[in-house]
Amino acid sequence: MKYTDEEKKIIDEVKKYLRELRLINIEKFSLTFEIEDIPSPQSIKYSNEVPGGFSKSKGEQITSNMLRRELLTKRLELFNMELDKFMTLVYLLNAGHRNIIRTYVCSRGYNEMIDTLEESFCISKSTYKREFPKACLELSKYLDMEHRPSLEKLNNMFYESIKNE
């Protein structure tokens, strides 16, 4: 399908919007794994021994990890809020476009996205290439392009909230 220059510009803007959401989603998963790797206070990973005098005491280790977990959780909440705002808009699209957009945002890369679309939704690569621009145009009606999500902006909000506490 042929698109006008204005439509092409809108499609590119929506793609940028979606790429930023993808970055936020990838960072969210990294944070989730990082939080899961923090040992609980009951963990046997904590030791009372101080080998070579370089380790913190058990109490300091536990306190440090609890604070770290709390900060990571706050950052994760910011990312979740941004993604949740967007995902509610996706439900305004038809099912095919919704599946394409959601998979685009939630995949780590192109090949993973194409595989997921084919395996989970029976959407071929050629169908994706044909329908993705249409989905972007439809989605653009609902997006606030003036307030595009940004990983950097969310990180700055997080650092400001820490400073203010």
Model-predicted segments: where are they?
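Helix-turn-helix DNA-binding module
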Residues: R108-T127
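Short amphipathic alpha helix immediately N-terminal
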Residues: L93-E112
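Short alpha-helical segments used as structural interaction elements across diverse proteins
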Residues: N25, M66, A95, N99, ...
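DNA major-groove recognition helices of helix-turn-helix
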Residues: Y128-E146
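A short, hydrophobic secondary-structure junction motif
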Residues: C122-P133, E160-E165
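N-terminal interaction/assembly modules
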Residues: M1-Y91, D144-E165
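Short amphipathic alpha-helical surface patches that mediate protein-protein
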Residues: E36, V105-C106, P133
